[in-house]
A protein has these predicted regions:
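Enzymes that bind and transform nitrogen-containing heteroaromatic metabolites
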Residues: 1-135
Length: 135
């Protein structure tokens, strides 16, 4: 399984049960990067309602996604799925937002290799960085 996450400068993902930010260009970039097909839960699907991509919405998407699927993760703990993940695309907001849920970067950085890094301007962010890691 492959995973896409969005984090701030301190690996924050959520604050008070809500995503920190969203960006139209990032969604387009992520969908294109994933080959136009994404798996996600209903919370994440709300922000993809106007994107032109094939979305599979399931609450248990991390358990049910095929091995080669790209899963856009915002509000699900990834630690129970570490053994299933082969690649991860981290989108960095390059800003600091309030957060109370952090992405477990330390769990990934010890075992993972950075294979690419790309920066691009977003619709609401001056600069977004995509980092792709694999085992």
């Amino acid at each position: 399984m492959n995973v896409i996450v969005c984090i701030d400068e301190q690996n924050g993902m959520l604050f008070n049960g809500r995503r920190q930010s969203k960006d139209r260009v990032l969604r387009e970039h992520a969908a294109s990067f994933a080959g136009g097909k994404l798996w996600m839960n209903s919370y994440t699907a709300k922000q993809f309602s106007e994107e032109n991509c094939d979305i599979t919405v399931e609450e248990a998407f991390l358990s049910n996604a095929p091995e080669d699927a790209w899963c856009f993760v915002e509000n699900v703990d990834l630690k129970p799925y570490l053994h299933k993940i082969s690649r991860i695309a981290v989108y960095r907001w390059n800003r600091l937002y309030p957060s109370d849920v952090k992405f477990p970067m330390a769990d990934f950085s010890a075992r993972w290799t950075l294979v690419s890094r790309e920066e691009f301007p977003g619709s609401s962010h001056e600069r977004i960085t995509q980092e792709v890691y694999q085992l």
